[in-house]
Amino acid sequence: MARHAGRGWYGRVIGAAIGVTAVAAGASVWTAQAGQNTPAAPAHHTTPKTVAVSPVIAHSSDGGAHAVNITIDDGPDPTWTPQVLQVLRENGVKATFCMIGPEAQAHPDVVKQVVAAGHRLCDHTVSHDTAMDHKSESYQSQQILDAERQITEASGGVRPMYYRAPGGAFTPYSRKLAASHGMRPLGWNVDSKDFERPGTDAIVATVRSELANGPTLLFHDAGGDRSQTVAALRTLMPWLKQQGYGFGFPVR
């Protein structure tokens, strides 16, 4: 997620919100031109060993220039994640869920629902510390690798395919570490601003107005009441299809 104040259950988060960290470095140029829907990419699979991926922050979609990536941060949440899953199912859309390690550990049944529905997992650290780019390498390693283990255990053995730094607080070290564990660093192009709960119409308007920034859209399924997010997704996904966009996963 982007850096935010007023985190609700984030009282245990280490570090204060200190402003949005830009993640545009390494982003591909986004083509706003619409096209046909593309077939859903293969979802997770459990592998016996880690295959290293690129440490460059991913922004583009494996669905091509006419596809968007739906990414959902900060869960899983036993109330809101199933509702997000239902909306995705109704629209035939796959998404990437960036999970907090202890939340995954606390709700393994929800993690398994995400995997069973064909969505992908993403490591969003243990404590959601948006200042972790100012912390030691050993601290960064603990945050990333402990969460990877917790998410993998909760999923029944399915590993996260991406790593999203809280608030975009990437470092060269954290990107290389995640990539060496098979997790592509994942940025975003459009922050829906749903975390502040500005109202469903405002969330929809933000995504529509900023869609030209790039294909990876950021939403949240935890950290408070996410009914506005659920409603916004219910409006946005049919609208995106009407505009000719397809849906994909972030590139690996």
Spell out what each predicted region is.
Residues 85-96, 120, 137-168, 176, ...:
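CE4/NodB-like, metal-dependent polysaccharide N-deacetylase domain
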Residues 169-210, 244-252:
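His/Asp/Glu-enriched short active-site or ligand-binding loop at hydrolase and phosphoryl-transfer sites
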Residues 83-84, 109-110, 173-177, 232:
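A short acidic, amphipathic alpha-helical/loop segment
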Residues 101-104, 127-130, 166-169, 191-194, ...:
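Short histidine/acidic/glycine/proline-rich micro-motifs that form metal-
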Residues 1-70, 77-90, 112, 235-252:
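N-terminal pre-catalytic segment of deacetylase/amide-hydrolase enzymes
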Residues 44-135, 143-146, 150, 160:
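Active-site beta->alpha N-cap acidic-glycine motif
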Residues 75-82, 105, 138-141, 168, ...:
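Soluble non-cytosolic domains of exported or imported proteins
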